[in-house]
Amino acid sequence: QWPVQIMLVPSNAPYLKDADLLIAADCVPFAYPDFHDTLLKGKVLLVGCPKLDDAQFYKEKITDIFKNNTIKSVTCVHMEVPCCFGMLNLVKSALSDSGKDIPLSEVNISIKGSFIKA
């Protein structure tokens, strides 16, 4: 699907209907070499950086996406560095604000490119 950047994805994009969402921090696909095969396959991707972009905008956009679509599940994947945990926090906040009960899972990637148990 296109676009993938949270800033650019319309909240009512057709590919969001009945989606399993993968919300990824920008650095993850570069740090984790098996990103496409192990994380992205079968999911709709939203990508962004909570440190460099407007986190409040992200929260509002993701809340709208949750409210206005039938999202089946959400996986939030981020790096182990402190700035990346902002993505998980804003996804949790958006989920709470949406009033929806959508299963949320977290994937934490080390700076060496491996999974870290959540």
Language model regions located:
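Iron-sulfur-associated redox domains of electron-transfer enzymes in respiratory
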Residues: Q1-A118
